[in-house]
């Protein structure tokens, strides 16, 4: 894809349209079990709610994240498994397992979403151990083959330890830091849980309470996924709205079950709460919309462009640079490669500040010593979060000098040897 932003936008839009289509297919299957007479009406209501929340800016977050891609494979995983339950063809179970394998390597904690299927396999076949083993084998086979392929690839590149660290160990330490309140404000996380997630949890309680009564496997599995969704949210421990996106299909279908099975008074309360949550979520999204076109985000974009144009003017395409900030924005805007394997300062800060012990800052310095990037895009002022990484701040102060100043950034130039 390279740096073709238009192609990226088209790709992300196609993914969004496709997962909305997949959700509608799942909604039709589930609502038919909730109310066989009005299932088309219910499935359309669920699609309307899904499309509304799924495309709010705070949840879609530019669409370039694992949650947006994960939705497609999560929905395919569930649909494939339901297909297997209906016709018992092994192909569907293997396909479901393949989708889970993709989910797992997109983000390790997505592994939780395999538990409803594993649990259902065990419970429905517990009297026949051979069936349990065979079905678990078919479901897990793609993951094993996928893992072996990755291990072989990284083994050939002498990077197995890096692969395991980046894919699993760092994420587990990050989760611990998140729950300690060191990643994002816990207060904001709790407010969002209370205002948005909690209402959907209460809707799903009706479904979960009727777990034993529901004899339809589709509703049983939906109950399992609802429980896992809330466990997943609680385990996050940090507030980034797009983290919640992966749970939307089950929260919304839980609401539809509530819609059909609640008593009249509870139904009215539930709808009012949904309206409140919708207005709150929409208002948040509109604030981001304003910020993008006329607020701080628009101002930041102008500065980023000015900084990038300057760096581009004083470097050649083959020159390496360092952007000591979050993400890869400046590498993309300048068309210059990073002088280190690390492109975001956030990972370096977490490792150094939280004492993870990976030595990322030392590796970062070694990379810069080898590539000797001519320029560094550096935060202006001393209040930047990334000034907490004293080791890197000291390195920049000893090896670079101020070249040009912008409002939020300083361009540093490497001191001649």
Predicted features, each with a name:
Residues 10-36, 51-52, 76:
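Transmembrane-helix motifs of polytopic, lipid-linked glycan transferases
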Residues 69-86, 92, 99-100, 121, ...:
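Specific aromatic-rich, kink-prone transmembrane helix
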Residues 83-101, 130-138, 217-227:
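Short hydrophobic alpha-helices at membrane interfaces in multi-pass membrane enzymes
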Residues 115, 297-354, 358, 364-386:
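Short periplasmic/luminal acceptor-recognition loop of GT-C membrane glycosyltransferases, typified by
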Residues 236-267:
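Hydrophobic/aromatic-rich transmembrane helices and adjacent perimembrane loops
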Residues 91-108, 114-119, 145, 226-235:
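Membrane-interface alpha helices of multi-pass inner-membrane proteins
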Residues 28-31, 35-37, 75-95, 195-216, ...:
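Membrane-interface transmembrane helices that cradle and orient dolichyl/undecaprenyl
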Residues 59-69, 240-241:
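Short acidic/glycine- and proline-prone juxtamembrane loop motifs at membrane-interface regions
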